[in-house]
């Protein structure tokens, strides 16, 4: 009874902190908060609080239920949110690349945690006795590796999607500061065509001289390089987790069903997802191939992960149907 109440309290605390952090992120998008010192950093600290809250929630549910909390969709979503929180904390303590990674990990952890605790899965939060197929020591090894792999691959894929958006985004040519009065005076002195010509010429000169580091294109290039750098490394870690998860699942399947591979829908989509990210890593080994090509492959992998993760849960068929939205 005590553990049940504690789990309920931790769930509400986590969701409340997530809601506050989400509000802060939305405010930073629509309101200029640069003058408020430490306001944006408070959202990062909120994710750290959420991490410890989710950790306590998982341990409490583990003790209360008597098994590792990865037996249904609700528990796997909580664990996935925990995985995103880990990545966020790594970037939080790595001040050099903090802004690049947190823009992906924080909202992801927020939305997943919010969805899991919002009441949409009202039939899932109640802990139940494990079905016979899950009563194995392989549960912790297999499912945790798969969820950690999903989390890392989703994060890396989102970085690749951000890379594509920034790469193909049209940048308006401009060389003056974004000041209303300045724009008004310039528009009064010059025609639009003359301004456009000067802007184009300025852009070319900035790319050719030694002061290229001060141009917008240079910082844009730096951001793209950083996104590609972190996307590759996070996906590499996710691929390792996914591989270990698939192999451990095959051993577990042989012990339970008498076969290493049964071409179950979950197994099939996991294999397709693994193949896509293997192609991604193969492309990255070729230095002559641009990062855009690998980013496109990772973007496809992003969709495949959600199909693999939610597909069987939506259909409720196959050997992995115990993780469907409607528990059996």
UniProtKB/Swiss-Prot annotation:
Membrane topology: Multi-pass membrane protein
One Pfam family recorded for the sequence: Cytochrom_C_asm
Superkingdom assignment: Eukaryota
Transmembrane segments: 13-33, 46-66, 73-93, 101-121, 146-166, 234-254, 263-283, 295-315
One Gene Ontology molecular-function label: heme binding
Keyword terms, alphabetized: Chloroplast, Cytochrome c-type biogenesis, Membrane, Plastid, Thylakoid, Transmembrane, Transmembrane helix
Gene Ontology BP terms: cytochrome complex assembly
GO cellular component, one term: plasma membrane
Subcellular location: Plastid, Chloroplast thylakoid membrane
Major localization class: plastid
Quaternary structure (record): May interact with Ccs1.
Family: Belongs to the CcmF/CycK/Ccl1/NrfE/CcsA family.
PANTHER family on file: CYTOCHROME B_B6 PROTEIN-RELATED (PTHR30071:SF1), HEME EXPORTER PROTEIN C (PTHR30071)
UniProt function note: Required during biogenesis of c-type cytochromes (cytochrome c6 and cytochrome f) at the step of heme attachment.
Name by which UniProt lists this protein: Cytochrome c biogenesis protein CcsA
């Amino acid at each position: 009874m005590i553990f049940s109440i504690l789990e309920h309290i931790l769930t509400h605390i986590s969701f409340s902190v997530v809601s506050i952090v989400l509000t802060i992120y939305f405010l930073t998008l629509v309101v200029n908060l640069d003058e408020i010192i430490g306001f944006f950093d408070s959202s990062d600290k909120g994710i750290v609080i959420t991490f410890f809250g989710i950790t306590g929630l998982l341990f409490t549910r583990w003790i209360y239920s008597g098994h590792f909390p990865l037996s249904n969709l609700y528990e796997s979503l909580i664990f996935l949110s925990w995985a995103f929180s880990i990545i966020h904390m790594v970037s939080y303590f790595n001040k050099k690349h903090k802004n690049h990674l947190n823009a992906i990990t924080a909202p992801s952890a927020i939305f997943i945690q919010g969805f899991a605790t919002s009441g949409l899965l009202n039939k899932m939060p109640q802990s139940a006795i494990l079905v016979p197929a899950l009563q194995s020591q392989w549960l912790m090894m297999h499912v945790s590796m798969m969820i950690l792999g999903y989390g890392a691959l989703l994060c890396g894929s989102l970085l690749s999607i951000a890379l594509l958006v920034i790469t193909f985004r049209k940048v308006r040519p401009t060389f003056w500061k974004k000041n209303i009065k300045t724009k008004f005076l310039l528009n009064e002195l010059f025609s639009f065509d003359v301004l456009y010509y000067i802007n184009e010429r300025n852009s070319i000169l900035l790319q050719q001289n030694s002061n290229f580091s001060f141009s917008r294109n240079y910082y844009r290039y730096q951001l793209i390089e950083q996104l590609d750098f972190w996307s590759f490394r996070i996906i590499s870690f996710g691929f390792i987790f996914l591989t270990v998860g698939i192999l451990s699942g095959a051993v577990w399947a042989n012990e339970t069903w008498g076969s290493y591979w049964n071409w179950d829908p979950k197994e099939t989509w996991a294999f397709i997802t693994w193949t896509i990210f293997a192609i991604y890593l193969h492309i990255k080994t070729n230095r002559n191939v641009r990062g855009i090509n690998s980013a496109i492959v990772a973007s496809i992998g992003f969709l495949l992960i959600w199909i693999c993760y939610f597909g069987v849960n939506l259909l409720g068929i196959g050997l992995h149907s115990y993780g469907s939205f409607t528990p059996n």
